């Protein structure tokens, strides 16, 4: 549904400042292209070299620099089964703290919209296929991806 003050969906994005964490990643490249196609003219992509999104001071500085109306949070510590097994605490802590602190700072600053992206790794180990959203909370994720999956699930 288009809000009564918008003539087209592009009107929504035209004057909004958008911050896309993880915008330099695989999914981020598609999100940036979609935003451009929809008329978003003010898009800020924080670079990992400039902002540690687990550090509260860096998060505050990022929000100060970007001044976003909308945040699309795609950034993550991601890896395969081996990486999750080798560093489970890092996968859980970094992904959870990054998301929670970004979300909390957005709330404190009155950001209009915050979008946190989930993952199929958040679904229970024995979820029927095709996956349905109603199944998300019906069990524990598959153990090899649980640290990442649980952290992302907690942001939904």
Describe the function of each predicted region:
Residues 57-96, 105-108, 125:
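NAD(P)H-binding glycine-rich loop region in Rossmannoid oxidoreductase-like domains
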Residues 10, 17-36:
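N-terminal Rossmann NAD(P)H-binding glycine-rich loop of SDR-like oxidoreductase domains
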Residues 41-61:
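Adenosine-cofactor binding site in Rossmann-like domains, unifying the SAM/SAH pocket
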Residues 91-99, 103, 115, 151-152:
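Short alpha-helix in the Rossmann-fold core of NAD(P)-dependent oxidoreductases
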Residues 100-145:
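Conserved Rossmann-fold NAD(P)-dependent oxidoreductase catalytic core, especially the SDR/UDP-sugar
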Residues 1-18, 64:
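Non-catalytic terminal and boundary segments that flank Rossmann-like NAD(P)-dependent oxidoreductase
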Residues 143-156:
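Active-site Tyr-X1-5-Lys
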Residues 21, 46, 71-77, 114-120:
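SDR active-site strand-loop-helix element
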